Amino acid sequence: MVHKALEAMVTYVREHPAIMYSSETIEKRRSDYLNVAEAIRGEEIAMESVTDVVLPLEGRMLQARHYVPLGDESKALVVYFHGGSFCIGDLETHDWLCRALSTTTKMRFLAIEYRLAPEHPFPAGINDTIDTLRYVAANLSKFAHEDAKLIVLGDSSGGTFAAVGAAQTRNENLNIVAQVLINPPMGPEIVTESSNKYGSGFMLDNDQLRADYLQYLDGYQDHTDPRVSPLMADDLTNSPPAIMVVAQCDPLRDEG
């Protein structure tokens, strides 16, 4: 049985296919992506609190949203990086998902609005991820209990950022105890059985993903750089344990 939210999303995308194609302006794709999120949004989820905050990173300010579930007793804070093929998505497109995950896990969430391509190409999003993890670890009492542990979570392109952030900070004693990677793309050069089988007609299109990678990398040619392709890392010693979540009919499935 297909979940009602998934059925609604598939129906909406079929009726509004512009979101899938780079021939549309980035502004139009972002608007359509938000419309998809609103179309599939479930019933409102009651929270103890939902608060918009600003993270003062070096040379820039990032927007973030802090979620505290009802009956909060969590000893962990989940730092969440949304999906959107490096180019689209924001706090609003993934707001309901964060509420649902926070409520289900009984954990506090901090969702990050990192900078997007093409306005801010590689390595802007990666730098935002790494600097965010450092800032949150150094200011943990602002977001969670002082002895809370950190979990880094990302879906799709946010999964790439989560994986890279966890790897790049693995020796910095940030108390990151786990990384959860949902449908993460692991590099622009990867070709798999699932990308061949599901790369067209299953919402996420191979051609669109390649186009978004081009915008994101903006001419950067070293695809063996582990910040681009996390699987190319030579040494992951001390990296937090990872949970990989994949979907059957997803071109990115085998990258997990």
What kind of feature is each model-predicted range?
Residues 1-69:
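A glycine/proline-hinged amphipathic helix-loop "lid/cap" segment
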Residues 74-84:
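Short beta-strand element of the alpha/beta-hydrolase
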Residues 82-88, 249:
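Active-site glycine-rich loops that stabilize anionic/oxyanionic intermediates
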Residues 92-112:
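Short amphipathic alpha-helix adjacent to the substrate-entry channel of hydrolases
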Residues 120-142:
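Alpha/beta-hydrolase active-site loop
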Residues 143-156:
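Alpha/beta-hydrolase fold nucleophile elbow
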Residues 147-148, 163-255:
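Alpha/beta hydrolase fold serine-hydrolase catalytic domain that processes acyl esters and thioesters
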Residues 154-164:
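Glycine-rich nucleophile elbow surrounding the catalytic serine of serine-hydrolase chemistry
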